C-alpha cells in the first residue's frame, strides 16, 4: 500500500474548504489551498515551523488570512500546540495521518 502524499490530503480537503488547490503566485510559489478568506498551507506535523512561515508569506501575498493544516499522528500533539504558541494569529487545523 502506498503512503499518501501531502498533495493527496490537499486534494481531499481543500475542495471542502471552498478553496482552489495549488494556486500559483506571481513569484511562481504555490499556495496549497486558497479559499476566499484564507491562504492555507498543508504540511506534516513535524514541519509545523515551515508551515507557519509559508502560511504567513502566502497570506501576505494574497491579502488573505493565514492558516495551516497539519497532518499528524495521535502522538504528535506537541507540534500543533507549538504552532499555536509561536503564531497565535494563524488558524491551526489538524487532520489525521
Question: Where are the regions a protein language model picked out?
Answer:
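Short, flexible coil/linker segments at or flanking structured domains
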Residues: 1, 21, 28, 46, ...
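Acidic-basic catalytic patches of nuclease active cores, encompassing PD-(D/E)XK
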Residues: 1-36
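Short, hydrophobic/amphipathic alpha-helical patches that form generic packing surfaces
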Residues: 11-14, 56-60
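Active-site regions of enzymes building and remodeling cell-envelope glycoconjugates
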Residues: 19-21, 39, 89-92
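Short connector loops at helix/strand junctions that flank enzyme active sites
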Residues: 28, 35-37, 53, 63-65
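Conserved catalytic cores of phosphodiester-cleaving nucleases, focusing on short active-site segments
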Residues: 33-44, 58
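Nucleic-acid nuclease catalytic cores
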Residues: 44-52, 59-97
